[in-house]
């Protein structure tokens, strides 16, 4: 396979599964599938996964993308490329049974599933690599395409690949994709070394090209929803895959484990009713726009399954709240859009008034920041909703980054005292709680046993019917969340 010019543009770990129960479907319900992994982060996994999704979707295949871990941003790019919502598979948050169930359910009508790994192939929660991408691939009996950064290396690439092949028995690396390849001679030397010493095919090559870089900023990649350059970025990845990948061999590798036909898998998926309710029992507003885009599809589906009608609100454009029984404000980048948020005075005033009148509100990270009095970034300060008596200060480095473990220690609208929750946080801000203890009616929902939260010990500000925290929760890891929120909305 020789390099060529780009082609022209063409077309707590839960012990129950709740309404996601799939019985004994397991691997027999899986479609052809691939895990896109790498020896380390920033090797090109997202570019490869995005390019593959775009090419296969353009061929007319139903492509179901997945992302390992709790990330929101990579899935936004995969969603756009595949033309189908990406779903997260998080071994640490969900556990094996729920991950397998979620994969079977999410891919039940797909022709192929593309699973993008996280960090290095064997990186996990601890020294043993618990919950790694390799473990996920084994759970799903999925072949792995290893993306390797080939900059400034030739024969030594074989040692790197071979080490990944042998490190954990049962991990099935089925092919290699080379990234940052300088020229045809470089590619030839790399390919010969891998084929001779690793007995693996090189099924794709990405040339050294800045156009194949997806834009990023202070918290990683920029979400596709707020990035006007997403079309050329996805097109560049697609064209590189089209020009430099052996797509037929890749499809062969994906299908080597077999799997049921789409019709049979669809019937299997029919065993997974979202809801037995004939009509919604409450209306929940969801602020979803360029400023707030961090929502797991399963969270929205779980709310619907519990009986909610979802009504979407744009915090940047909508002047008024619709008629709703509760409000859900997910994460995002309010610090980037503080001017627009500040300018929408009428909506901010209505949200604050609704909270004072008892509207149930659940907010995560960016949503917490929006409910505060203000956001300060350097010498800039933006007025926010002001429902919570605290201020947000942006810093130059992560304040909380990674998994969190929480224990419910205080009264709150959703969770019983003593409950233990697992979630994720990733924020460059801190909350100034000066004077917090002197304000009546405020409480703290969570004690932090792992992670940062508000101050390393606490998370989850409670005020009236508001629960706002830095922690992001996933409905498959916290199955009681959706039903509790809908019940609170119904109760008013």
Residue ranges and their predicted role:
Residues 334-413:
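Cysteine-nucleophile active-site neighborhood
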Residues 27-140, 148-175, 183-188:
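ATP-dependent carboxylate-amine ligase catalytic core
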Residues 292-302, 309, 394, 401-492:
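C-terminal and late-domain segments of enzyme folds
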